[in-house]
Amino acid sequence: MIVRTLEEIEDTDADIKTENWRSKRIVLAREKVGFSVHETTLYAGTVNDFWYANHIEAVFVFEGEGEITDKATGETHQLKPGSLYLLNNHDKHQVRPKTDMRTVCVFNPPVTGREVHDENGVYPVIVEDEEEAAS
């Protein structure tokens, strides 16, 4: 059994901070459970273009408000506490938080925590090597 708190993750290599968002990676590929879990805050007034070409992502909003736009169709949905969006078709999307928006994100395949969005908003697939996974 693994038990973690967000406080334990703060200011570690699993606490990723950018100008637009902060993501605390709670469960990563090294746990070998087939998914990763992150608590991510997207900052008010930012525009975030993402495309998880190599991952499926589910996002549950538990604080704040914003909107998500499907970049293929132009369809926009309002996001508020209790909203969930599932990017089951590797959808290119844009998230625009009106207020700081706190979310729980689940990725499959799991991320390692070392991924960086490329120019298209894509995470590469990074496979944990066996030696790192054992530590």
UniProtKB/Swiss-Prot annotation:
InterPro entries found in the cross-reference section: Ectoine_synth (IPR010462), RmlC-like_jellyroll (IPR014710), RmlC_Cupin_sf (IPR011051)
EC nos: 4.2.1.108
Top class in the EC scheme: lyase
GO biological process: ectoine biosynthetic process
GO molecular function, one term: ectoine synthase activity
Catalysed reaction, written as an equation: (2S)-4-acetamido-2-aminobutanoate = L-ectoine + H2O
Regions annotated as coiled coil: none
Pfam families hit by this protein: Ectoine_synth
Pathway(s) where this gene product acts: Amine and polyamine biosynthesis; ectoine biosynthesis; L-ectoine from L-aspartate 4-semialdehyde: step 3/3
CDD domains registered for this protein in UniProt: cupin_EctC (cd06978)
Keyword set, alphabetical order: Lyase
NCBIfam families: PRK13290.1 (NF009806)
Entries under HAMAP family matching the protein: Ectoine_synth
Job of this protein: Catalyzes the circularization of gamma-N-acetyl-alpha,gamma-diaminobutyric acid (ADABA) to ectoine (1,4,5,6-tetrahydro-2-methyl-4-pyrimidine carboxylic acid), which is an excellent osmoprotectant.
Family statement: Belongs to the ectoine synthase family.
Name by which UniProt lists this protein: L-ectoine synthase
Origin species: Saccharopolyspora erythraea (strain ATCC 11635 / DSM 40517 / JCM 4748 / NBRC 13426 / NCIMB 8594 / NRRL 2338)
